[in-house]
C-alpha cells in the first residue's frame, strides 16, 4: 500500500489517501462477490437502531473507491482524480456535523454520495455517476482491483491496509518481491504493469488502451503507447488524460 499526504488546508478526513493494488483476482469468486457485497450493503434494513448500526458497520468496511486499474494509465492519472475529488468534497464538508453533504454539484460541491465515489466520478469525462462506475469501477470481469481510501493524517495505516486485505485476500496484494513491512511502495508500477516487474523497461503495460481511447475520445494506437524505446507518445497521452480530468471542474 502507498500512502500519500494531501494539503493540510483540506478537511482532516481528506488529508491523506491510501492506495492498494490487488492482482490475479478470480472474477467469478472474488470480483463478482465484492460487487454483490457492495450492493447488499446498500440494501440493508435500518428500521431499528440495531439494524441501522449493523448496516453502518458493514458500509464502513466497504468505504473505499473500487477501481479497475486497467482503466488507468498511471498513478498520476489516478491522483489527478483524487485531487479534484478532494477539492470538491472539501466544499461539501460540514465541519459542525463532521459529515460530507451530498448532492451539491450545482453549487460546486459533491455530485455523488461519498468522497470515494467522487474519485471515480472525476475520472469520467461525462457527468453521469452511473456511467463513471461502469467505466472505471470494479466489474464482474475484473481480474485486478485498486482500492482508494481517504483518511485523516493520524489514521492507523496498518489498520487501513488490514481492512483492505480482509476485504480481498492477502495472497492477491501486489507488492515488490523483496518489500519489507515498512518499505515505501510506488503504486505506479502495479497500476501500469499489474505487478512489480524486475525489468519494467521490457514489460508491456496492462492498461486497456482501447477502452481509454474510447472513453477519452483519443485514437492513439497501443503499439505507440507501449513503445519502450520511445515513450513520448505515452507521456503525451498521460498529459492529455490528466488534463482532461483536471479540466472537469472548470468545465462543470
UniProtKB/Swiss-Prot annotation:
Protein name per UniProt: EKC/KEOPS complex subunit CGI121
Subcellular localization: Nucleus; Chromosome, Telomere
Family affiliation: Belongs to the CGI121/TPRKB family.
InterPro entries the UniProt entry points to: CGI121/TPRKB, CGI121/TPRKB_sf
Protein source organism: Mycosarcoma maydis (Corn smut fungus)
Any one of the GO CC terms: chromosome, telomeric region
GO terms classed as biological process: tRNA threonylcarbamoyladenosine modification
Transmembrane segments: none
Its job: Component of the EKC/KEOPS complex that is required for the formation of a threonylcarbamoyl group on adenosine at position 37 (t(6)A37) in tRNAs that read codons beginning with adenine. The complex is probably involved in the transfer of the threonylcarbamoyl moiety of threonylcarbamoyl-AMP (TC-AMP) to the N6 group of A37. CGI121 acts as an allosteric effector that regulates the t(6)A activity of the complex. The EKC/KEOPS complex also promotes both telomere uncapping and telomere elongation. The complex is required for efficient recruitment of transcriptional coactivators.
Gene giving rise to this polypeptide: CGI121
Amino acid at each position: 500500500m502507498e500512502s500519500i499526504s494531501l494539503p493540510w488546508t483540506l478537511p482532516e478526513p481528506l488529508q491523506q489517501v491510501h492506495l492498494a493494488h490487488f492482482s490475479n483476482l478470480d472474477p467469478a469468486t472474488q470480483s463478482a462477490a465484492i460487487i454483490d457485497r457492495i450492493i447488499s450493503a446498500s440494501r440493508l434494513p435500518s428500521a431499528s437502531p440495531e439494524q441501522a448500526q449493523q448496516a453502518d458497520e458493514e458500509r464502513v468496511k466497504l468505504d473505499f473507491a473500487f477501481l479497475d486499474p486497467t482503466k488507468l494509465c498511471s498513478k498520476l492519472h489516478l491522483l489527478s482524480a483524487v485531487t479534484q475529488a478532494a477539492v470538491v468534497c472539501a466544499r461539501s464538508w460540514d465541519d459542525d456535523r463532521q459529515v460530507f453533504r451530498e448532492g451539491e454539484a450545482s453549487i460546486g460541491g459533491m455530485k455523488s454520495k461519498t468522497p470515494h465515489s467522487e474519485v471515480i466520478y472525476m475520472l469520467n469525462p461525462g457527468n453521469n455517476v452511473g456511467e463513471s462506475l461502469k467505466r472505471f469501477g470494479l466489474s464482474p470481469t475484473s481480474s485486478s482491483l485498486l482500492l482508494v481510501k481517504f483518511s485523516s493524517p493520524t489514521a492507523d495505516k496498518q489498520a487501513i491496509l488490514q481492512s483492505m486485505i480482509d476485504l480481498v485476500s492477502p495472497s492477491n496484494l501486489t507488492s515488490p518481491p523483496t518489500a519489507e513491512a515498512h518499505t515505501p511502495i510506488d503504486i505506479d508500477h502495479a497500476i501500469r504493469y499489474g505487478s512489480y516487474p524486475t525489468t519494467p523497461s521490457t514489460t508491456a503495460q496492462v492498461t486497456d488502451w482501447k477502452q481509454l481511447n474510447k472513453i477519452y475520445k483519443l485514437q492513439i494506437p497501443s503499439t505507440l503507447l507501449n513503445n519502450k524505446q520511445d515513450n513520448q507518445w505515452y507521456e503525451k497521452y498521460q498529459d492529455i488524460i490528466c488534463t482532461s480530468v483536471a479540466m472537469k471542474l472548470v468545465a462543470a
